Amino acid sequence: MMKSTNRSSLILSSNKFVCNNITNGKPMNIPVKNHNKYSSEPVSRSWGQIYSNNIDRYNLHNSKLSKKKYNKSPYYSDTYYVNYDNNDFNNRPYDAIKNCKSAGIIPYTFKNGELYFLFQRAEDPQRKKDSGWNDFGGKQLNSSETTADIAAREFSEETSCLFYLLEKLSIESNNNNNNNIKFKDLYDLLKNNDDLFYSRETIVNLKKLIIESKKFYSDKITEYVLPIFLSSKETYISYFVRVKYIPESDLPKAEDFHIPYEDRYLRECRWFSLDDLMNLNEKDFHKRLQITRIQQRIAKYYEKGLFS
């Protein structure tokens, strides 16, 4: 994992968040605090796993925790958990990453040095519980899907892989080959159009891209020992993932074009600055994000410079 020499800092001025010293980088880790003053082991308040204050994230096997016995997570190659005795089985902290059956992604980016988060909402939801600003996510398709897989697949489907194509364009920009032209053409085909019509060939290409994009963003989430996320325990987990900026107008006004819905609902996608996000009423969010105390968690992550 890359280290960033400059971190985001929180400045409160006239009740506004101002982002300073932003550099290109990646989210570092979730906050880890001591759960009580009598314990030497800190606990992550996000999902209760116990970690050392001095984990060497480049050489975990050389850290102070190496004297203990660990199990490696079956889902995350770089995540280590402390073993518990059989008698303490019921007292083990809940692991949202391992146990949630639904997951999504909250994309964030920096534009002109300012932090933005992308959300979507249905314009005319058929059910009241489907109203409000939401992330890009959904349910597990099968038992082999990890939460990172679920989140990456749903995000790819609901954004028509535009963010993935932009990443590929960035990678290929310095190469003089046909791939750059191909990715640009696919982006133009898949971005929003007024009649919401996409040819059969475009849909075939989208289905292929979803597989690639799912792997790309799943790897992006799991490359960190401690990814940053929101969790409502066993119900839902939403990962924060840094993306390249895409204009709202490019994002399709409907999602999942590779699926033949009879009634496809329209949606609005919007980038929110940190100030705008903090000024929203909690009830403006989708129900599954309300219970995560999303604004409080984002503010704490920002104070710690984790959006980088």
Curated annotation (Swiss-Prot):
Species this chain originates from: Acanthamoeba polyphaga mimivirus (APMV)
Source domain of life: Viruses
Gene3D superfamilies listed in its UniProt record: Nucleoside Triphosphate Pyrophosphohydrolase (3.90.79.10)
Alphabetized InterPro entries for the sequence: NUDIX_hydrolase-like_dom_sf (IPR015797)
Database matches in SUPFAM superfamilies: Nudix
Protein name according to UniProt: Uncharacterized protein L534
